[in-house]
A protein has these predicted regions:
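N-terminal signal peptide c-region/cleavage motif recognized by signal peptidases
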Residues: 17-19
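Bacterial N-terminal signal peptides that target proteins for export
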Residues: 1-8
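Short solvent-exposed coil/turn linkers within tandem alpha-helical repeat scaffolds
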Residues: 55-62, 102-111, 140-150, 174-187, ...
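Compositionally biased alpha-helical segments
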Residues: 21-141, 153, 157, 161, ...
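Flexible, glycine-rich surface segments
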Residues: 166-215, 225
Length: 268
């Protein structure tokens, strides 16, 4: 018994001694006209400045207007959290991680990507209001994020779910006229989605094809673009809703031939 107690105490001591898992700390390199420096980086929104702490624990402050470039290292926990949202497996843990990343990486490159996936996680939980709030926290600091970049698509999806069509249409128009091909293609897909969200009536299917999916297929035909593959898949679904199976099959075949590696080519 004495030996058992000694072993148990040793085990407990070892457990107590284990270090807590450290969360991601933003690190990277700040470049100015006079040189560059690397270390832990945070953004102070109130002062519009970056604070860098180097390996010698020295802190340097850079005003935003004197910084030429900020290169941030990708957070180690981001990809695993994204995978959990994509598979809807371990969603609560993924959301907790993404909430932290969105906060800690504020104005540091990966806040938009983390927020986009965080919003998708909230939507999987059926909480469009939370998804909108998460996106708008980023948009307040960077208004362009409402119609371009990694947050925008998730924001539009949340607006569709929440029935906020007036705000959605303004943002889709901005994205389409922005000159950014990726933003424009994504916006046209969401314009189609907004029509289909009203139901599978023939008129909605026609609108989704005319104003959304077919425009992407004709104007933004790029097999490497996720929006193009998505438009082919959803265009086929819309034709199917109109009982035009030959057109639906043509788009499905086009999707498999041109975008075989896309997840949309494997979707049912």
């Amino acid at each position: 018994m004495k030996q058992f107690n000694i072993a148990l105490c040793a085990l407990l001591t070892a457990c107590v001694a284990l270090p807590a898992l450290a969360k991601d700390t933003p690190t990277g390199t700040i470049t100015t006209a006079t040189g560059s420096a690397s270390g832990a980086i945070r953004w102070k929104n109130s002062a519009k400045e970056y604070v860098l702490t180097n390996s010698k624990n020295m802190t340097v402050t850079y005003k935003a207007d004197e910084v030429e470039n900020v290169s941030i290292d990708r957070p180690a926990s981001l990809d695993a959290a994204i995978k959990k949202v994509q598979t809807n497996n371990g969603l609560a843990a993924a959301i907790a991680t993404l909430e932290e990343l969105a906060k800690d990486y504020n104005h540091l490159t990966y806040d938009q990507e983390a927020t986009g996936w965080l919003a998708k996680g909230y939507l999987l939980q059926g909480n469009a209001a939370k998804a909108i709030a998460a996106c708008e926290a980023v948009i307040r600091d960077n208004p362009e994020a409402a119609y371009k970049g990694a947050t925008a698509v998730s924001y539009w999806e949340a607006l569709i779910k929440d029935g906020k069509s007036a705000k959605l249409n303004i943002l889709l128009d901005k994205a389409i006229s922005s000159g950014d091909k990726t933003a424009a293609a994504n916006a046209l897909v969401k314009r189609g989605d907004a029509a289909m969200a009203r139901g599978s009536a023939r008129a909605n299917c026609e609108e989704a094809l005319r104003d959304g999916y077919l425009r992407v297929i004709l104007l933004y035909a790029d097999p490497t673009s996720d929006a193009y593959a998505e438009a082919l898949y959803k265009g086929a679904k819309a034709f199917e809703g109109m009982s035009q199976s030959s057109q639906a099959n043509r788009l499905r075949e086009q999707l498999k031939q041109e975008c075989p590696a896309s997840s949309w080519a494997r979707a049912k």
